Amino acid sequence: MDQKFPVKKVSLICAKGSIEDVYASLIMANGAVMEGIETNLFFTFFGMDAITKTRMDKLHTGVVGNPALRLPGGMRMPSLLGIIPGMEAFTSWMMKGQMAKLDIPPVSEFLDLITAGGGKIYACKTAADMFKLKKEDLSEHVSGILTIGEFYERAAGEGSQIIFT
């Protein structure tokens, strides 16, 4: 028997603040919104950088200890090179350049696309308290600062999925 169980709601949790981690969440959230799926995006811990006004468009790629890091063209970059001063900034600049060539929008614009399509963006109360962030420090796209329990209430329901990126 081949039954289909459609996804009706996607709730993503973004806990890391590197370019590749934040964009994984943004791309999946935007895709869900475009498919007409109810979408919640919850930022916690270092993922909060993606919704903090002063940091959201200044994310970096972690180079130290990243064994999957490749240069354009696919050449492997030894993680030991990450200790060279300026390597993280250079790698992040290259990554952003590649994304611009593919017309992938900056974080602030991505948040606009997601919310314009009906997606909801939330900040974690514990992380906001830890980092001493207030609602006014966050992007205008943030619908609220929630406890994890409040987020789970919004994430619940038949056909719901929670994805941790």
Q: Language-model segments: what does each one mean?
A:
Residues 1-21, 27-30:
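N-terminal glycine-/serine-/threonine-rich phosphate-binding loop
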